[in-house]
Every structure is written in structure tokens, then in C-alpha cells.
């Protein structure tokens, strides 16, 4: 924002997607359904893993935490977005914006770390099966999960720390459906170079490091699979990785669009669409992806349903 006369404000206005009341009503119904499916799908994954002894393995422990993170990620954004569909503009206190951004960044960053941990788990299972029990022990799993949440919190601290040092001025209208960092910077009358660079370096580092771990894991996995003589063994190894690769491609494909591509190459509306995809749609798709192509999950679900009916 250009320097000059301004009035510091304590709340911001989220403009959402559209001013058209009919479109807002349709979007409200669509995203309410998506949010309901997200909550039910991910909660079902968590309950299924907890209640199925055959799923008490490192792979499914990580998956249960991914499901929990997806619930938190979607819940950080969707309720405010639904509220915005009921009115033209959504008023939110700056403190509320800080809390929402902190939650979004925490869960989003934690998801990156968990996806990397899951790639490492698949690497150990396929490339070093005899060492799996020691290299993916319960202690190692707890450390991986704890480090994932800690990494998410640290990254969120860099964003919220910078945001708390900013002042916001009129016009205090944010052209977005939630308190994302970049749109908030546009209405700040006090931001400097560091408030742009520090969060970018922090989030960029997480993306680069986790993508490197995932890519390296799958290079070794691919080499190991190609060395297998058994066709059945190859198919089994590929099937255990397909769901994870699909989830990784969807998640990193969208956040790369946001954080890597030059801002001038896409519009604010395109930014909103991509943001909806990775904060709202992907958390709904993950439990479907991991359920449809996973024999263990399908079998556990059948057993649980059979036990429930008896």
C-alpha cells in the first residue's frame, strides 16, 4: 500500500467469491456437502484404524494423523467460507485473521511433513523390508509424527509473527475467501521487505525439503521394484505406493501453483480456485484415495461392518 494518510483498522472484510446471491446459495450447498464428506470420510479413517488391530502399523498410524490434519485444514477455512456465502461480505477481526492463518499454515505445513514421512515409510518397507521393524519402530513413528506437527507450528510462527507486526488500513477489503497471507499484505500500510521474504523462505524451504525426500524415496523404490523378478511382487509394491503418489501429486501440484509460479502469471480469481482445491477439496479426496485402492483398508472395513452387524 502506498504511504500517505490512512486509518488503522482492527477488522478486515473478506469479499469472498461473488456478489451474486443465487451463485452464493449454490456454492453454499456444494461446499457444505464437501465439508460434510470431508469430516465423515476422515473421521471414518481415524476410527477404522483405531478399531482395527491389523491396521496398527506405522503406515496407518501416519495415515490416521494425515486424516486428522485434513480435518483441521478444512475446518480452518470452510466454516468462514460458508459464512461468506450467506452474505456479500464477511467481517473478521484482525486477531481472528491471525488465528485462522496460524491454523491454516500449521495444518498445511504438517501435511507436507506427513506426506514426506509416509514416503520414507514406503521406502523402508520396499527397499529394506528386513529392517522395517527397527527403522520404523513405534518410537521412530512417534518422532516422525511429533516432528511433523512441530515443523508445522514453527512455520506458522513465522507467518503469524510477521502478521502481528503489521498494521492494516482502509480500504480494508481482502479479495479472498479466507485470511491468506498475500492478500493481507496488500492492505497493510506497514509491511516491509522482511514480512514478504521470511514467510516465503520458510514455506519454500519446507516444500523443497519435503519434495526432495519424497522424490528420493521414490527413486529408490522404483529401482528396487525394477530389480524384482516376481511380477506379483512388483504389482504389490506398486499398489502400496499408488494412493500416496496420487495424494502427493494433487497436493504439491496445487501448492506449487501458488508458491512457485510468478504472481503476475495468474489472476486473483485463479488464486482463489486453486486455494479452494488444496484447502477444501483435497482434504475430502484423501480418504477416498486411500480407501479405494487399499486392500487392507477395504478388508478392515468389511470386518468392522461384519462385527457391527453381529
Curated annotation (Swiss-Prot):
Q: Which cysteines are joined by disulfide bonds?
A: 97-189
Spans traversing the lipid bilayer? 26-46, 55-75, 100-120, 134-154, 197-217, 238-258, 272-292
Q: Which GO terms describe its molecular function?
A: G protein-coupled receptor activity; olfactory receptor activity
| Gene Ontology CC | membrane; plasma membrane
Topology of this chain in the membrane: Multi-pass membrane protein
Q: Name one Pfam family in it.
A: 7tm_4
Look up the domain of life of the source: Eukaryota
Task: Print the keywords alphabetically.
Answer: Cell membrane, Disulfide bond, G-protein coupled receptor, Glycoprotein, Membrane, Olfaction, Receptor, Sensory transduction, Transducer, Transmembrane, Transmembrane helix
Annotated localization: Cell membrane
Task: Look up keyword Transmembrane helix and say if it applies.
Answer: yes
| Residue numbers on the Extracellular membrane side | 1-25, 76-99, 155-196, 259-271
GO process annotations (BP): G protein-coupled receptor signaling pathway; sensory perception of smell
Q: What is its main location?
A: membrane
- Spans within the Cytoplasmic topological domain: 47-54, 121-133, 218-237, 293-310
List of glycosylated residues: 5, 165
Relate the protein's function as given in its record.
Potential odorant receptor.
The record's similarity note reads:
Belongs to the G-protein coupled receptor 1 family.
Recorded protein name is Olfactory receptor 5P80
From what organism does this protein derive? Mus musculus
Amino acid at each position: 500500500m502506498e504511504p500517505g494518510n490512512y486509518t488503522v483498522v482492527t477488522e478486515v472484510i473478506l469479499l469472498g467469491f461473488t456478489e451474486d446471491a443465487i451463485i452464493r446459495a449454490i456454492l453454499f450447498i456444494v461446499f457444505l456437502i464437501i465439508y460434510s464428506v470431508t469430516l465423515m470420510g476422515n473421521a471414518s479413517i481415524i476410527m477404522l484404524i483405531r478399531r482395527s488391530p491389523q491396521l496398527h502399523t506405522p503406515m496407518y498410524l501416519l495415515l490416521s494423523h494425515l486424516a486428522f490434519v485434513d480435518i483441521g485444514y478444512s475446518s480452518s477455512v470452510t466454516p468462514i467460507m460458508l459464512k461468506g456465502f450467506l452474505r456479500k461480505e464477511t467481517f473478521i477481526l484482525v486477531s481472528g485473521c491471525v488465528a485462522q492463518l496460524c491454523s491454516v499454515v500449521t495444518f498445511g505445513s504438517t501435511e507436507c511433513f506427513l506426506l514426506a514421512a509416509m514416503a520414507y515409510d514406503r521406502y523402508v518397507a520396499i527397499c529394506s523390508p528386513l529392517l522395517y521393524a527397527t527403522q520404523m519402530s513405534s518410537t521412530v513413528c512417534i518422532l516422525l509424527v511429533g516432528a511433523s506437527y512441530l515443523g508445522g507450528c514453527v512455520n506458522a510462527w513465522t507467518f503469524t509473527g510477521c502478521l502481528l507486526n503489521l498494521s492494516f488500513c482502509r480500504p480494508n477489503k481482502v479479495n479472498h475467501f479466507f485470511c491468506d497471507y498475500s492478500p493481507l499484505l496488500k492492505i497493510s500500510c506497514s509491511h516491509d521487505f522482511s514480512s514478504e521474504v521470511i514467510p516465503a523462505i520458510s514455506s519454500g524451504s519446507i516444500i523443497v525439503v519435503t519434495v526432495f525426500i519424497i522424490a528420493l524415496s521414490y527413486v529408490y523404490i522404483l529401482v528396487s521394484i525394477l530389480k524384482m523378478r516376481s511380477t506379483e511382487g512388483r504389482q504389490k509394491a506398486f499398489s502400496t505406493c499408488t494412493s500416496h503418489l496420487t495424494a502427493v501429486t494433487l497436493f504439491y501440484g496445487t501448492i506449487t501453483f501458488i508458491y512457485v509460479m510468478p504472481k503476475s502469471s495468474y489472476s486473483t480469481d485463479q488464486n482463489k480456485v486453486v486455494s479452494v482445491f488444496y484447502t477444501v477439496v483435497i482434504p475430502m479426496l484423501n480418504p477416498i484415495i486411500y480407501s479405494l485402492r487399499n486392500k487392507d483398508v477395504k478388508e478392515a472395513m468389511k470386518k468392522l461392518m461384519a462385527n457391527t452387524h453381529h
